[in-house]
Amino acid sequence: MGRHKKIKPKSFSSPKGTHDILPQDQKYWERLRHVSKNIFSYYNFLRIDTPHFEETGLFLQAVGAQTDIVEKQMYSFSTEGGDELTLRPEGTASIVRAYLENGFVAEPHPVKFYYTGSFFRHESPQRGRFREFNQIGLEVIGDENAVVDAEIIHVFSVFLRELGIPEFYFHVNSVGCSDCRPQYRSLLLQYYRPKAKGLCRDCKRRLKHNPMRLLDCKEEKCRIFKKNAPQLLDNLCEACKKHFTSLLEFLDEAGIPYILNPYLVRGLDYYTRTVFEIFTDSDLGGELEIEKEKEIVLEKVPEKTEEAEKPMVEGEVAAEVKIEEKPKVLKGIALGSGGRYDNLVSLLGGREEPAVGGALGMERLVTLMKSLGLKVPGESKQRVYFVQLGDMGKKKSFKIFEELRKNGIAVGESLGRDSVKSQLKLADKSGSDISLILGQKEAIDDTIIIREMSSGIQEVIPQSKMIEILKKKLKR
């Protein structure tokens, strides 16, 4: 009778586009959460958490049925009970749903939220881009003033500086509103239709359903057409022009670095007026190429003219937006993005309520922090190691640990080992300054051995004096 060949169990790895956050990296993630909480709370943003999955219809209605996210990137599934659900691909739709469902409409406005969490998109994984990814986000609902757009950008700037990131800048643009976009859409169609044969397959579809998304295509053969495409900034209505000019004045006053990118659009249909992206020039493997840098110039209205002598109407902008082109190639990696979404609340069943928000990618921030060699406060250095011998030593160990914890003394241990020699080797390897040794005799006598690792000198002390003596030795 032949011997049966043993079948090797199948091994597993993390799903494509996902990653483990390992113990040695946790300090970076804790740093992001800690700094974001402190800064966002200071600016009166309230923490909110929403489910990782929502009704599929929420994203169809909010994000837009013709967007790449809805058509290609959502993880959707049906339950046995017949529910159609989707893992959240972005945060804003869920925040607005929670705002409406939980009665925030009755609260004093604006309502300001911040959040952190995981999101999911079926994209092609690459460095800095995952299918499960984490974001830190801000949302403000209930204020149309451009100063709120500037506040979102300002708070993100403060956050990045607090992390120690030295260089970053914002790309900003206005995508207008329902009053000025139809005319611009017609101009785009006039420009792109004769070039339809040269477009990629996705852009041929966008030409029919969502022409503005043509400006966001990453295919090189489509990008070359963008150079001479009409600019929305030239076709903004007066209200949108004033709003955008006001935003730029706020950014100038705050000293926030920005570049006007008149071809910047976002991949979500709900955006109106302000849109922005945040970049760093640090080499993290990502690359953004802009054919021409657009320099914004705010030309003040001359002081002494008949027009200037007329009293200004409240809200009137005393500046003209002028765009100058300078050939330049910029390389960088996107850290985050955002914009205004004045129609989304009503689109999801609420009253007309202006809103603005944005989000930063946490994976990219962690990668950047590592690349820059930023010092991140970690856990307190372990300077004490606990060595036990016998069952009595093990049983008494938890009381010892708790006493050390209450006094802020970090301790290492290996309770599963019985050999004192092997435990002392681990203590030495860990870099601990002191070992506490608890054997059978010490456990019975309520004493403990304190050993200095550098000299090997040790003494027996009462457990009641352990904390006092430890603190004195650790101060040396």
Features from the language model and the residues they span:
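TRNA-recognition modules of translation machinery and tRNA-sensing kinases, especially anticodon-binding
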Residues: 2-476
